[in-house]
């Protein structure tokens, strides 16, 4: 059981994690992760295991896109299991092609000690999290 209230889960996901991604703020994004975190993109079964692997994945994501936006959030938090599921829209603009691509996504986050311990990412299109 979590000692964090429901609002904490929504805050770490929207005001820290996704806000950091949308603004290219690596320190803010990585500050959300537990030292032994993992991130798995489920459609391609791509695993980023560990803090350094996740950071490397975000370096690539930020380098490939001039704009990243997440919005239209719908959240369901389960404080007993220290988890939150977030559905949202994503827009990214490629630096290489200048093409805007829209996705729908759903992420399932599990927290430990107030940090993201594991996240499972479901994307409606190509895996951007290589």
Language-model-detected regions and their locations in the chain:
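Short, low-complexity N-terminal intrinsically disordered segments enriched in polar/charged residues
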Residues: 1-35
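A beta-strand edge to alpha-helix "cap/lid" segment located at domain peripheries
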Residues: 2-5, 55-130
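Acidic side chains
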Residues: 22-25, 41, 78, 107
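Alpha-helix boundary/capping and short turn/kink residues
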Residues: 23-26, 45-48, 95
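Secondary-structure boundary/capping signal
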Residues: 25, 37, 66-69
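A short gly/proline-enriched turn/hairpin at secondary-structure junctions
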Residues: 38-48, 60-64
